């Protein structure tokens, strides 16, 4: 269908109310001002002036102006400014700050109601006027932006429509502060040179007391936040001069506020004992994955276009046949050239896609720089930049979160590129919160290492700060202003200043006379006392920062025990929370629920299965209290251990409660049998409080304590043919130890809990709409149907959204009374307006299955992820078999009809596993081969395979590194030997040539008529003389 046919269709409209809505993204007012400074920096400006002009007739009493000498804009560039979201800077390799095409509009509208922009480029002068006042007074709902243009030399209008130009200038004269053409031209004349931009914001926003939010009166050299107390507020939160000084990690643009230069800083040059740490991680993949998906999408479209053009060229060539007329050849040549061009473009797009796919697997490297702020020790924390622009400041990490003196006064600096972390629209945070927390955690670890490396704590923290003049016990008090302390601080941190002409940074040598010297705003290289750096032509010297290394200390047994105790406490809190749940049997019970409670607890473990945890470490098992020998019974060698499930029985009768006063016991069976009816989950009547072990601490005996919870807990239990014993004896020493999970698994667990909490709040609203579909029983859904529906997880499907089909994967399944719903997470979403996931009904017209890709077309990460999901599903199905339902906790006879593998097969598999583990056992593994040889199947189930694989890979890598280093040393030795031999060869050839020259000279003295021109002639002549002599 031709594009012209779309002219009658509806289009998205941008109302002028969106101007205000868009501006609310800037909670931090200085962030809005920084957006306009960023635009000047991206335009390669060397200077920007920020100043206020008094205009009492305007709201706020003054206009705020931003004048730079950057590249400026021509009319087409200025027209793209008013297109929200359009940016020419959005490339993965871009080092420019602007990426979203929104900063000028959102920043200016946050400061005031109206702004007018004057820009010059080459021979054009363009004015852009965006006014909410104009829209309000004219009653216009859509956004209208006048954009008149003049010739820079003749000042004549540049337009094809004189009437349109007249309307645009009339609006500018009526609603802007400049009411005549002369006043408008005067603004253009303020722009120095042939290019630059002037942005004027007026009708500023006011506070509740009628005063503007920006204070330009208290300090004539600064722009401050109105009504902000200096006490307890960081300088950058109160003073725009202080904020602009650290806004860029490597400032290359001069910033003037009210005509006074901002002394910009390179933070790494302002710290005591700076040290750099290189950090490499493969966790930062979100932005890179987005770029890969975009590149794949673009490459696929380019490939389709190229194939279509090639097909068209072949068809035309066949159809023309023997037609050799000139017009036919020209037409054929044009089609073929188009096909060749499109094929080249497709090849380029494919190479870009392949490069991005390779880059996705490469670990990202960041440089952490830490140092001590001895000038203001209370101003400490992490400064995190993105593409050299400050995003977060004073972020506390690691030991600083504890609030003590450890790591106090330390400042960290890191510059994160776009491909690692992407900032939010207001550039005050990062879009991916999970990866940002991972970055902070890594900086915390390196901060602790830096604190050890500089050894301040070993010398004494108080003594260290006393040396630099911090004599007060109050941490926030400034240092002493005595001259000796000022000199002491100045000796440790050399002065680094920027030249006003070449914009290069120069480090000045220390001089006692310059301790209290204030350098002028127009400092230049010729004022440098260093003779090697006293001219602008001299190259800039890089700061020499020592390189540090992160050394991870192994955890002590005490730390492991402490983490284990904390894990047990958390599990007990979960158990207590589960005991407080109430069943839902009718709509009356549903109405009694608080709003944040979901009414689908039964589907919860099926819809969101927990990721299997790591098994406990054998070292922890050995340190656990052993079972008393008096109650141990010999274990038959042929006894087969099986896993069973704790299921919840019906409420006990009075007689049964008398028999089990503190808890009800279940006797596990040899083989699991399916109950006749699915168990209805209820809460038992109140019983006296009892100390209950956590869910994962299940005694490995025949008597098991039932957990009175709303959810059916599925936990593998090891059975032994021991006679029943008293509860107090059975629980005395048989608690299984928990393995301490690593930090990343704990973080993922916390993420899942928060996500479930959010989904729980939404589930209540959905349940109220579907309340009429609830039955009187909470357990109507059959578990078999639920398990069958869960097999749909991981399916690759296509979903239709807004008449477009998008590929994705089923991540969750919800079984209703009448239908099954899939939650599909999309692989690639082209715009921010399309959701990243969506609930669809299975079998509807908006969803269809997609043929799964073959293994060779999947990336290693995809194959690994799919393998993990498949293993997790198999494990869940193996554990999810229900146990025979028992009444009132009475023991039942084991089912001997169930099929089971032979004991010899089990023992053979255990022996094979032991042999494999012994064969590949790492050298420094805590479990020896001797201990491994006597492990039984229960201990092998708890074997720490994750740590085993990790140490094996480390050992293998060390072995490879040793071979590599040995090969490298041999190669270096061979290269050195080769260079020596080549040197000797050259020396010998030079001696031979010199000898031949002397022989020729000697022969010419003896016989003047000898004519020898080449070395071969000389050799032949000498050989002939020797032959004649003989």
Curated annotation (Swiss-Prot):
Residues 629-646, 856-865 have a biased composition (Polar residues). Residues 285-362, 555-583, 738-775, 966-1011 form a coiled coil. Residues 532-543, 550-577, 763-772, 779-791, 837-849 have a biased composition (Basic and acidic residues). It comes from the Eukaryota. Residues 693-702 have a biased composition (Low complexity). ATPase activity is dependent of phosphorylation by PAK1 and presence of DNA. Phosphorylated by PAK1 at Ser-737 upon DNA damage. Phosphorylation is required for ATPase activity and recruitment to damaged chromatin. Pfam families: Chromo_MORC2_6th (PF23327), HATPase_c_3 (PF13589), Morc6_S5 (PF17942), zf-CW (PF07496). The modification Phosphoserine is found at residues 614, 703, 728, 737, 741, 775, 777, 854, 859. Zn(2+) binds at residues 499, 502, 525, 536. InterPro entries: Chromo_MORC2_6th, HATPase_C_sf, Morc_S5, Znf_CW. Keywords: Acetylation, ATP-binding, Chromosome, Coiled coil, Cytoplasm, Hydrolase, Isopeptide bond, Magnesium, Metal-binding, Nucleotide-binding, Nucleus, Phosphoprotein, Ubl conjugation, Zinc, Zinc-finger. ATP binds at residues 39, 87-89, 99-105, 427. GO terms for biological process: chromatin remodeling; constitutive heterochromatin formation; DNA damage response; transposable element silencing by heterochromatin formation. This is ATPase MORC2A. It comes from Mus musculus. The lineage of its organism: Eukaryota, Metazoa, Chordata, Craniata, Vertebrata. The gene is Morc2a.
């Amino acid at each position: 269908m031709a594009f012209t046919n779309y002219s009658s269709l509806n289009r998205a409209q941008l109302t002028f109310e969106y101007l205000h809505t868009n501006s609310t993204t800037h909670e931090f007012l200085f962030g809005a001002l920084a957006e306009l400074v960023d635009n000047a920096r991206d335009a390669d400006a060397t200077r920007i002036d920020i100043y206020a002009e008094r205009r009492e007739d305007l709201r706020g009493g003054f206009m705020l102006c931003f004048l730079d000498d950057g590249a400026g804009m021509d009319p087409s560039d200025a027209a793209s400014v008013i297109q929200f979201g359009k940016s020419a800077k959005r490339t993965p390799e871009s080092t420019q700050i602007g990426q979203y095409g929104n900063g000028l509009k959102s920043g200016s509208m946050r400061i005031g109601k109206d702004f007018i922009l004057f820009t010059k480029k080459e021979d054009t002068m363009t004015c852009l006027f965006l006014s909410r006042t104009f829209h309000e007074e004219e009653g216009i709902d859509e956004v209208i932006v006048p954009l008149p243009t003049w010739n820079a030399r003749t000042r004549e209008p540049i337009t094809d429509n004189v009437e349109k130009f007249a309307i645009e200038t009339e609006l500018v004269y009526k609603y802007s502060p400049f009411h005549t053409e002369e006043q408008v031209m005067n603004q253009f004349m303020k722009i120095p040179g042939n290019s630059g931009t002037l942005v004027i914001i007026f009708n500023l926003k006011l506070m509740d007391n009628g005063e503007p939010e920006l204070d330009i009166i208290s300090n004539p050299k600064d722009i401050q936040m109105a009504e902000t107390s200096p006490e307890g507020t960081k300088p950058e939160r109160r003073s725009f001069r202080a904020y602009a000084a650290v806004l860029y990690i490597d400032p290359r643009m001069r910033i003037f506020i009210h005509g006074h230069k901002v002394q910009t800083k390179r933070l790494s040059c302002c710290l005591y004992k700076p040290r750099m740490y290189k950090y490499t991680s493969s966790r930062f993949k979100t932005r890179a994955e987005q770029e890969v998906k975009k590149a794949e999408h673009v490459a696929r479209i380019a490939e389709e276009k190229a194939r279509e053009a090639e097909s068209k060229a072949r068809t035309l060539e066949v159809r023309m046949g023997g037609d050799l007329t000139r017009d036919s050849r020209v037409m054929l040549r044009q089609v073929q050239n188009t096909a060749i061009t499109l094929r080249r473009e497709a090849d380029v797009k494919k190479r870009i896609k392949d490069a991005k796919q390779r880059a996705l697997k490469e670990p990202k490297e960041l440089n952490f720089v830490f140092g001590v702020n001895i000038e203001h020790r209370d101003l400490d924390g992490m400064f995190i930049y993105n593409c050299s622009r400050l995003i977060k400041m004073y972020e506390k990490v690691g030991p600083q979160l504890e609030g003590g003196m450890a790591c106090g006064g330390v400042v960290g600096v890191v510059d994160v590129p776009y491909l690692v972390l992407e900032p939010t629209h207001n550039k005050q945070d990062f879009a991916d919160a999970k990866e940002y927390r991972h970055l902070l955690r890594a900086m915390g670890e390196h901060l602790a290492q830096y604190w050890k490396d500089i050894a301040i704590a070993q010398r004494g923290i108080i003594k260290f700060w006393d040396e630099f003049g911090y004599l007060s016990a109050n941490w926030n008090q400034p240092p002493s202003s005595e001259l000796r302390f000022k000199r002491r601080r100045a000796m440790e941190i050399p002065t680094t200043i920027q030249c006003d002409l070449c914009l290069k940074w120069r480090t000045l040598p220390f001089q006692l006379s310059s301790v209290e010297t204030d350098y002028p705003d127009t400092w230049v290289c010729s004022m440098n006392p260093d003779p090697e750096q006293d001219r602008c032509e001299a190259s800039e010297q890089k700061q020499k920062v020592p390189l540090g290394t992160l050394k991870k200390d192994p955890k002590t047994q005490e730390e492991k025990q402490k983490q284990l105790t904390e894990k047990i406490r958390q599990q007990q809190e979960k158990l207590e929370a589960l005991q407080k749940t109430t069943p839902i049997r009718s709509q009356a019970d549903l109405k009694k629920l608080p709003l944040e409670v979901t009414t689908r607890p039964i589907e919860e473990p099926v819809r969101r299965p927990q990721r299997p945890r790591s098994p406990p470490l054998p070292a922890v098992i050995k340190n656990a209290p052993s079972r008393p020998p008096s109650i141990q019974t010999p274990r038959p060698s042929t006894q087969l251990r099986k896993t069973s499930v704790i299921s919840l029985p019906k409420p006990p009768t009075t007689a049964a409660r008398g028999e089990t006063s503190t808890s009800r016991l279940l006797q596990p069976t040899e083989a699991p049998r399916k109950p006749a009816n699915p168990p209805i989950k209820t809460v038992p009547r109140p019983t006296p409080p009892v100390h209950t072990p956590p869910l994962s601490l299940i005694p490995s005996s025949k008597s098991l304590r039932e957990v009175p919870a709303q959810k059916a807990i599925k936990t593998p239990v090891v059975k032994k043919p021991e006679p029943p014993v008293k509860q107090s004896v059975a629980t005395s020493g048989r608690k299984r130890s928990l393995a301490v999970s690593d930090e990343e698994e704990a973080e993922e667990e916390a993420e899942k809990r928060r996500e479930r909490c959010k989904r729980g709040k939404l589930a209540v609203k959905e349940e109220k709409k579907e309340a009429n579909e609830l039955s009187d029983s909470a357990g109507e859904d059959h578990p078999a149907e639920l398990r069958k529906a869960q097999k749909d997880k991981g399916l690759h499907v296509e979903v239709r959204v807004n008449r477009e089909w998008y590929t994705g994967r089923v991540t969750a399944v919800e079984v209703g009374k009448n239908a099954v719903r899939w939650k599909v997470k999309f692989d690639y979403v082209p715009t921010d307006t399309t959701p990243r996931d969506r609930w669809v009904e299975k079998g509807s017209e908006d969803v269809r299955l997609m043929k799964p890709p073959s293994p060779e077309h999947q990336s290693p990460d995809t194959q690994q992820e799919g393998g993990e999901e498949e293993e997790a599903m198999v494990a869940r199905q193996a554990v999810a078999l229900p146990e025979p339902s028992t009444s009132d906790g009475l023991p039942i006879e084991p089912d001997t009809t169930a099929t089971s593998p032979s004991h010899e097969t089990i023992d053979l598999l255990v022996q094979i596993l032991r042999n494999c583990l012994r064969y590949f056992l790492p050298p420094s593994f805590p479990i020896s081969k001797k201990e491994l040889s006597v492990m039984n199947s229960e201990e092998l189930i708890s074997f720490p395979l994750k740590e085993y694989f990790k140490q094996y890979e480390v050992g293998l890598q060390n072995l490879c590194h040793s071979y590599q280093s040995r090969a490298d040393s041999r190669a270096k030795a061979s290269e050195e030997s080769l260079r020596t031999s080549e040197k000797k060869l050259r020396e010998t050839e030079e001696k031979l040539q010199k000898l031949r020259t002397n022989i020729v000279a000697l022969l010419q003295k003896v016989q003047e008529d000898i004519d020898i021109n080449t070395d071969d002639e000389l050799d032949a002549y000498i050989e002939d003389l020797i032959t004649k002599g003989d």
